[in-house]
């Protein structure tokens, strides 16, 4: 199994790049407005240390490949990576050569023997159906890629470098051509990927105890694999957000009014409770709620305890002050914390107290020496909103990828890297 242990993969700092053409899979899937201006450069910024390391250590060239959006294997100009060029030029203080394709004879020629220190950005990988293996045709019908053509696509990409570096953790759960199909002798994690793998290895392979998972979000069924896998690793688990109501209803038969509720999840919730008991994992649920008579910031709002229950026509949209206190105690005990999913509807100011308090408590735990990891997606959005990205140990850049890692799944993009 060792080849899939995430903590022992080759990383860029162990590779001699001097005089080499370095082919780097980055994640430049950046948000664009309708005038094709980039609205957040965060993903580009995050790749710069990897690129600067290669240039500083004498790489002959850097060839950057990425996807942007979902063009489904068709060339769609609105998904061009061209807008990235200006941002990269500003950051790296050098010209960037942009190629209008990512494979083929012309691209291979441009990348074969470039001048020392050249940085090349390829056009969107997903303009070719061979990147993802499926897409749509001009009529919008779903089509699968021809395996022979996929092989050619991968061979053409492989010709563009001497060393392969993967820095696209956000796509690591996809077995796409640029993630698993590059056939070079050294396949290393870039610094962004390395940081992700190091922190998840710390939590999943050698956590300091007590280990706490904080899990939120709407549906139990979406998080079932995550909960089940973590029940074999953690000492305590806080279950909050919308999915807490399904547990409250089935396990304690509490009145939950019109709160989020999954009718089909009865067996799942009972199995989780049983598994937690068997594994000596202490589960924490909300004991009070902030409720509203409609899903709106200007709704009528009140706080109720779980024993009072939530009246019909009202819904729980955040946890209450008692729960916040209990969560604070639980968080302050932990030495390793993984957090995936908000505690309430944090996007609306009247229902963000539970999430904001948990964030403050996780920041305090970090200050006191705990390793704290925030999974991607909504929880990463919370960290950005509350300006805490540099106040916790690690905020993951990959929503889907971090979720699959925490679920115990293998990530194809990680498995494909060279072992140490």
From Swiss-Prot:
Its EC number is 2.7.2.3. Keywords: ATP-binding, Calmodulin-binding, Cytoplasm, Glycolysis, Kinase, Magnesium, Metal-binding, Nucleotide-binding, Phosphoprotein, Transferase. It is an enzyme of class 2 (transferase). It comes from the Eukaryota. ADP binds at residues 217, 241, 346. CDP binds at residues 217, 222, 241, 341, 346. One of its GO terms (molecular function) is ATP binding. Pathway: Carbohydrate degradation; glycolysis; pyruvate from D-glyceraldehyde 3-phosphate: step 2/5. GO terms for biological process: gluconeogenesis; glycolytic process. ATP binds at residues 218, 223, 242, 316, 347, 378-379. GO terms for cellular component: cytoplasm; cytosol; membrane raft; phagocytic vesicle. The modification Phosphotyrosine is found at residue 199. Residues 209-228 are annotated as: Calmodulin binding. Its cofactor is Mg(2+). Mg(2+) binds at residues 218, 222, 378. AMP binds at residues 218-219, 223, 242, 316, 347. Belongs to the phosphoglycerate kinase family. Monomer. Interacts with calmodulin in the presence of Ca(2+). This is Phosphoglycerate kinase. It comes from Dictyostelium discoideum.
